[in-house]
């Protein structure tokens, strides 16, 4: 069973399932500070792999960070509906910047469709195509709706928090395995506690992804690059000479 090595892999499956569908307009996003747990297991789920991760979301930005990790990912929606991607290395106080060209070369989608799945885990188009049932129970006083159906042929069950535009629980059932994403904590006292601030980001050393290949022979760069193995495309750079 595939191990979820980093946060990119936690969300890759969700994004690949959802961004293939047509883009549908999304309701306004509330600022969110939430912790999720992704569980992957081979059916009948006697053993599982669990990954805890955080999402800090504003209407124009999403930061994703695996619990206790030294790195995080920052996605920012630009005015032109293109996504800006940064890989933040907090211990090294560095940020790897990826241009739109870099993202295309790495086959990473960076448009309004992907933004919707990043900030809500499910697209509005997919929700609209599923069987919808209002629940009597609530989550922290917020209304819940269940959605049942298939996303790209995969059996899917969602318990949706309408006001937050995020799942309380999301279950994908494959022929041989199951993936569950569960909201386990929501901080309402400080919506951005733990998120990287603009001041922190400004103090970090900016590194362009396109320049990393030229740094690999620097002994200083090799030290911090060794801690960037989870950054997109770094396995490719590691094989260049």
Each model region followed by its residue ranges:
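Gly/Pro-enriched, hydrophobic low-complexity segments
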Residues: 63-67, 86-91, 139-205
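N-terminal leader/targeting segments and the immediate start of mature chains
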Residues: 6-60, 200-232, 236-241
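Surface-exposed, polar helix/loop patches in the mature regions of secreted/periplasmic/lumenal proteins
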Residues: 91-157
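An acidic-aromatic
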Residues: 53-120
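Solvent-exposed loop and beta-edge segments used for protein-protein assembly and interaction
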Residues: 26-30, 79, 141, 164
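Solvent-exposed helix/loop surface patches that form functional interfaces
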Residues: 108-125, 130, 164, 169-171, ...
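Hydrophobic/aromatic beta-strand elements that line small-molecule binding cavities or substrate pockets
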Residues: 50-55, 73-77, 156-160, 183-187
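Positively charged n-region of N-terminal signal peptides that target proteins for export
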Residues: 1-5
């Amino acid at each position: 069973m595939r191990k979820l090595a980093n946060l990119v892999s936690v969300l890759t499956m969700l994004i690949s399932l959802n961004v293939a569908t047509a883009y549908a307009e999304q309701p306004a996003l509330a600022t969110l500070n939430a912790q999720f747990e992704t569980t992957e297991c081979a059916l009948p789920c006697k053993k599982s792999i669990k990954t805890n991760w955080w999402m800090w979301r504003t209407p124009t930005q999403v930061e994703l960070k695996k619990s206790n990790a030294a790195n995080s990912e920052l996605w920012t929606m630009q005015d032109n509906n293109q996504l800006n991607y940064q890989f933040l290395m907090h211990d090294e106080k560095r940020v790897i910047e990826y241009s739109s060209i870099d993202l295309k070369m790495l086959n990473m989608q960076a448009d309004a469709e992907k933004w919707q799945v990043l900030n809500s885990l499910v697209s509005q188009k997919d929700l609209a195509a599923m069987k919808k049932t209002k629940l009597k129970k609530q989550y922290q006083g917020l209304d819940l709706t269940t959605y049942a159906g298939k996303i790209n042929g995969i059996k899917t069950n969602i318990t949706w928090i309408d006001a937050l535009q995020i799942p309380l629980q999301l279950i994908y059932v494959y022929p041989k395995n199951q993936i569950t994403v569960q909201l386990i904590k929501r901080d309402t006292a400080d919506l951005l506690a733990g998120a990287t601030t603009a001041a922190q980001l400004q103090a970090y050393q900016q590194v362009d992804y396109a320049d990393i290949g030229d740094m690999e022979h620097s002994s200083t760069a090799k030290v911090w690059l060794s801690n960037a193995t989870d950054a997109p495309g770094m396995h490719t750079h590691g094989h260049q000479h």
